[in-house]
Structures are given as C-alpha cells and as structure tokens.
C-alpha cells in the first residue's frame, strides 16, 4: 500500500513539499518534489494494527488512539495548508497550540473519568509510596507534558526520518515501562505502582514502531 499512497501523493501534490531556503543549496535541490503527509501512512498502519491486536475493551487502547489520531489530524491540516498555499507556513503556532491544548485537556478529562485507577497524584518511580497530589493543577501539568512532547518532535522534524527515529526510541522505552507497570508481579518486584490494563500500551508502542520502520523504508 505504501508505494500506491506515495504515487498518489506525488500526483496530487505535484510540486511536493515546500522547502525552506535557509539550508544548503544541494539539499534544497535534492529535496524538491518530495511529497509530504507521510504521517498518513504511519497512522493508517498503526490504527489497523492496534484494532487487530489490542484489547478493544481496554480504555487505554481508545484513549491513546484518540490523542494520537487527533494530533495526527492537526498535522494533516497543517500540511494541507502548506500545500494549498505552497508555503512552509501552515497553521499558525498560536492556533496550533490552542487546538493541541484543547485535545490534551479532553484526553486528561477522559482519563480521569473512565480509568478506575487514575487520579490527580503524580507518582515517583521506585519510591512506591511517594507521590504528590497536584489537584486541579494536574490538568495543567498533563496538557504541558502532552503539548510540549508533541512540539519537541516538531523541532527535530526533517525530510530524512529525523523525527521518526527518536520517536521509535521513546516508544521502545515506553513499551518496556508500560509492560512492567501493567504486570502485577514485576511492578511489585521493582517497587513501582501497578496499574491494571496499562500493559495494552505495550502493543500500541510495538505497532507504532513497526509503522515507523515501514515509513523509513519508503522515506
């Protein structure tokens, strides 16, 4: 499906991704005509894999899929505007952060409402009984972490997999963490808080890594 999507994007985009003129000339020339919206391929492969292999009755499956696809949609709109105006300027930074913050707030709210073990406490690894109750500030903290993490990826983004490789490294780390936290035996042995059902995030991370590797093959 990858080659077909790439051909479709090339046909529709024609001129390809708008390139900034502040880089080396050889790089600007080499990248002319490069299609954008490659994240569509990643999200499509990820969504199919998650729906096939994760527990669809697990609340964490839907929450993490919701925020991933929501932020993916924001990126899609940003790329679409760049192509429409053929400019490297898409959504303004202010509008993008506002939309991201709204999505992050909805995610945090749903996490509190639908997850039985979720609360406003910030837990510290290894120190099992050490925690800080953030109260309503927990929402601000959650929004800051989610939006900040998303935009830190944007800062490293490029045309040669500069963003997806660090993402896969982080995903590999979180897959281990979610597995240990979601396993009653290992979490007790390592003196970390056990959260029932969160192990499904491990499958999500693995699916995301696989989708990222597939993206790199065509990148």
Question: Where on the chain are the PLM-derived regions?
Answer:
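Membrane-interfacial loop-to-helix junctions in multi-pass inner-membrane proteins
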Residues: 32, 57-65, 84-99
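Membrane interface segments of multi-pass transport proteins and intramembrane proteases
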Residues: 82-92, 123-132
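Active-site His/Glu-centered metal-binding helix of metallohydrolases
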Residues: 77, 81, 102, 159
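Cytosolic, membrane-interface loops and tails of multi-pass inner-membrane proteins
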Residues: 4-31, 80-89
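Select subsegments of transmembrane alpha-helices in polytopic membrane proteins
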Residues: 31-43, 94-103, 201
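Cytoplasmic juxtamembrane interface segments
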Residues: 36-37, 73-88, 143-145
